[in-house]
Amino acid sequence: MRQIFRLSVAALLTFAVGVQAQVITYPEGLATGMPHNDDYTVRVRVPGREWKDLFEYNVQVDMDKVQDASMVQFDMGSPVEVMVKKNNETVREVAIRPLNNKVAYKQIQNTIFFTLDKPQYLSVEFNGDRLHNLHLFANPLETEKYVQEEKGVIYFGPGVHRPKDLPNNQIRIPSNTTVYLAPGAVVQAKLLVDKAENVRIIGRGILNHPIRGIEITDSKHVLVDGITVVNPDHYTVFGGGSSDITIRNLKSFSCKGWSDGIDM
């Protein structure tokens, strides 16, 4: 009996290590029609395992003179190794911001390697170029996922979603609803939470070029967590007359006036 117990404990420990030592990438991003940026080649892996390719999204920044930057993201549940290769120029200088994170790297020609021991959001810059940088989002693992629409859940799966015949290209979210943007989902609409409560907007998907990203008015108990908003026309999150609003792990890119703001 004692031997069986020890074997069971060992099996449980092995399972726990397997669950924790993981990195989740989003290959669905290759099929969304979102533009790709060839400036970088980025891969990630759990130490000792095979490298996984990431999709390098093209995102636009800077209002005075619009510039093309790059963005990648993945989820991590244990330390990971990252490889970043600069494809179109010789690397003379490297900065990984925020500098306070003190991310150490090793450089081999035009490629750098570094290890992340926890989720964090970084800007990788070569040769002092802050406008054509790589935005690297190492997200925490999702604690809640959906694979289809169900009661109380609006589900956007991998692919491009263009809601038709909706006033102002917006999707109204009712009370007691979870909106889940799956990895690889690209939604081209504004999410409107008006006179509603107990609403959650979660996932790893993208709101792409909406009029506004998320609008929250006269509502309460609203959570926004994990999604990315790319170049809204006006505000990333806009709201008023609301209470108990929580925003976590939100990523936003913009190249228009007022489009990067969170105005509550």
Predicted regions and their residues:
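Extracellular beta-strand-rich solenoid/capping regions of secreted or surface-exposed proteins
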Residues: 114-116, 161-178, 186-202, 208-223, ...
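Solenoidal tandem-repeat scaffolds enriched in leucines and small polar residues
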Residues: 244-245, 251-264
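Sec-dependent signal peptide recognition
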Residues: 2-10
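N-terminal signal peptide c-region/cleavage motif recognized by signal peptidases
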Residues: 16-18
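Extracellular "leader-to-stem" segments immediately downstream of a signal peptide or signal-anchor
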Residues: 21-175, 186-188, 195-198
